[in-house]
Amino acid sequence: MDLQAQLEELKTKTLETLQSLTGNHTKELQDLRVAVLGKKGSLTELLKGLKDLSNDLRPVVGKQVNEVRDLLTKAFEEQAKIVEAAKIQAQLDAESIDVTLPGRQMTLGHRHVLTQTSEEIEDIFLGMGFQIVDGFEVEKDYYNFERMNLPKDHPARDMQDTFYITEEILLRTHTSPVQARTLDQHDFSKGPLKMVSPGRVFRRDTDDATHSHQFHQIEGLVVGKNISMGDLKGTLEMIIKKMFGEERSIRLRPSYFPFTEPSVEVDVSCFKCGGKGCNVCKKTGWIEILGAGMVHPSVLEMSGVDAKEYSGFAFGLGQERIAMLRYGINDIRGFYQGDQRFSEQFN
């Protein structure tokens, strides 16, 4: 077969093969292009035969070679567009969404257990005549520490690692600053002050099963004439019974807080074993629940309240602590991980 006939045969077979590659055949198309037009392809091999042609025939066949190469090059380009379109269509078909199918049912959210606990506690205090007072999470060092009888050189400041924003501005470590601000504004000629302040507080602590760098407190304050430790105990007994059941009892143990004098730790009788001793109460029959005490005279005096005429008590409890005890939760981190499986248990 002469060279011209071989060129025509190569052109015809290549075009026929190209027309068959109409689907997602990117690799096959590339392989064919290399086999025909590549440096070691069929057309290149045929070009080597030009040297054996006569001087008269060589220009004619050379022109035919160029025409075949140009034709096949254009044919490969056009077929590449067809193959790419087929590839895109195949991808669209594979990823298409049937809009007639019913949608996925929306998952219902649940009120967070801490929200439930906070509202229950607030309702108890509202029923006892307390007012709910909100405060600032970003607070002045003055109100967070100094007004709580913790001057700058007081060693008890080491009890609380603090997130400082500036030397005088911080994230509050307790909700006690609200008590100081409310004391400043209260008009005692209209009666005693009875308030609770719920809110989030922050301490530089390493997160683990029982500690968190942020948590929630509810602190209470009662200031008036002739307020005694007996009033504190009676108030706490009523709160504990409403939260944990009428059969619960409390005990007060001496403690120390800079802003109260005297200060006490409050324990509740174990609600699992009834005071007999178990793993929850560590065989003691009692569970530590909150801290409290009579308001320190210095705290009253700094608000312009005559400590000789007025007295009061304060207490603070943690919402996470209450919720963990009530619901048997053993890891505080569960409150903050946003796991719906955790939240829906308390719906």
Curated annotation (Swiss-Prot):
PANTHER family listed in its UniProt record: PHENYLALANINE--TRNA LIGASE, MITOCHONDRIAL, PHENYLALANYL-TRNA SYNTHETASE
Enzyme Commission identifier(s): 6.1.1.20
Similarity comment text for this entry: Belongs to the class-II aminoacyl-tRNA synthetase family. Phe-tRNA synthetase alpha subunit type 1 subfamily.
Biological-process GO terms, alphabetical: phenylalanyl-tRNA aminoacylation
Cofactor(s) required for function per UniProt: Mg(2+)
Disulfide bonds: none
Gene Ontology molecular function: ATP binding; catalytic activity, acting on a protein; magnesium ion binding; phenylalanine-tRNA ligase activity; transferase activity; tRNA binding
Record-given protein name: Phenylalanine--tRNA ligase alpha subunit
Gene assigned in the entry: pheS
Catalytic activity, as annotated: tRNA(Phe) + L-phenylalanine + ATP = L-phenylalanyl-tRNA(Phe) + AMP + diphosphate + H(+)
Organism for this UniProt entry: Streptococcus pyogenes serotype M49 (strain NZ131)
Record text on cofactor binding: Binds 2 magnesium ions per tetramer.
Superkingdom of the organism of origin: Bacteria
Subunit structure: Tetramer of two alpha and two beta subunits.
Keywords associated with the record: Aminoacyl-tRNA synthetase, ATP-binding, Cytoplasm, Ligase, Magnesium, Metal-binding, Nucleotide-binding, Protein biosynthesis
UniProt subcellular location: Cytoplasm
EC category: ligase
Ligand binding (Mg(2+)): E261
One GO CC term on file: cytoplasm
Chief location of this protein within or outside the cell: cytoplasm
